[in-house]
Amino acid sequence: NPLSSVNPTDIESFTVLKDASATAIYGSRASNGVIIITTKKGKTGSVKINYSGNVSISTRKNKIYVMTGDEYRDFIINNPNATEAMITAVNLYPGVNTDWQDEVMRTAVSTEHNISAYGSVKDYLPYRVSFGYTNQNGILKTSNFERYTGSVSLTPKFFDDHLNMNLNAKGIYIKNQFADTGAVVGAGSFDPTKPVKNDNNKFGGYFTWTTDNDPNGTKASSAGVNPVSLLEMTDDQSKVKSFIGNAQFDYKVHFLPDLRLNLNVGMDYTKSDGDKYVDPSDPGSYGEDPLKSGSNYLYFYERRNTLLDFYAQYSKDFAKQHFDVMAGYSYQNYHYESN
C-alpha cells in the first residue's frame, strides 16, 4: 500500500483531481482520478519543535460462538450416531477446553512517535525536518508493522521572490511481520477438546491429528491444522526501503513578469526483500521425508519511478479580456523488477 509509507503528521492537505482535469495533466493513467498529497513546509521565523505521541489499543469486536470442549464432548457422547472412534477422540484429553479464538487473537498495543522542527535561515531559507516511528501490533498474534520515516523540506526564494524553489526528500524503512490468516478460519473450526501442545517430538510439540491418535504417529492428511502452529511455526517478514524526492523550480521572468517557467523533477524508489520460512516440524507442511518438509522462500521487488515536468505559462489581462496560454513537456519512466 503506497499510503503506508506516508507519515500522517507530515501531511498538509489532500487534493482530489478527477474527470478531465486529471487526464489533462497526468494522461490516461489518471483516468480514475488522482490524489495529490501535499506535505508540510518550513515557515519563516524562529525554530519551533513539535512532538506528538500516542498509544493505541486494538481488540476484536465480536467473537464467533462455538462449543466449549465440555459442550462438544457431551454433544458427541450423547449423539446416537456417534461412532466409537469419535467418542474415543473427544476423550483423549479429559477436561481440556481450548478456546482457539483466544489462542490466536490478542489485545494489541501500538505506539507512535513523531518529532518535527521548522523555521528559517535568515528569512530566505525556510526548512522543515521530521522523524517518525510507528510500531503497530496486529490483533492476530505474531503480526506486526514497524515504520521509520525521515523527511527534509527546503523552500528558499531568490531574486526578490522571482525564483521559488521547493526541495523535498523523504526516506522510509518498513518492516512487516505477516501472520497466516488461515489461523482465523482454523480457530473457528478446530476441535476444542484438544490442547495447543501435547507430548510429541514430531510436530514441534503442537497437537496434530494422527491416523491412530498416537502423538508421534502418522499425520492424518485430511484433518485440519492446529491454528496456533500456523502462526508460530512460520516466520514471514519483509523489509521495505523507500526514497521519495522532488525538486520544483518556479521562475517569474524578470523582464516579462507575466511569463512563468516551472520545472519539476522527482523520483520514487522502493526496494523490498522478503523471507518466508516454514519450520520442517510445522504440522501443516510436515512430511515423513525430512527433505520434503518445511520451506524457505525468498522474494523481492524493485520499483523506480522518475518524472520530469516542464511548462511555460503566459497570463495577461487586456481590458476586460484575460489571455492565458500554456505549453509544456512531461516525461516519465517506470521500472519494475521482481522474482
Please give the residue ranges for each predicted region:
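Residues embedded in well-ordered regular secondary structure
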Residues: 1, 33-34, 41-142, 161, ...
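Flexible loop and strand-edge segments within Gram-negative outer membrane beta-barrel domains
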Residues: 92-104, 108-132, 136-143, 149-223, ...
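Membrane-embedded beta-strand positions of outer-membrane beta-barrel proteins
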Residues: 49-53, 129, 167, 247, ...
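Short acidic/polar hinge/loop motifs at secondary-structure boundaries
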Residues: 1-19
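Short beta-alpha junctions and helix-cap segments that line functional grooves
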Residues: 2, 21-25, 35-36
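Short, glycine-/polar-rich solvent-exposed loops and beta-turns at beta-strand/coil boundaries
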Residues: 6-9, 26-31, 143-146
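Non-catalytic regulatory/gating segments with a bias toward low-complexity or hydrophobic composition
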Residues: 14-15, 35-37
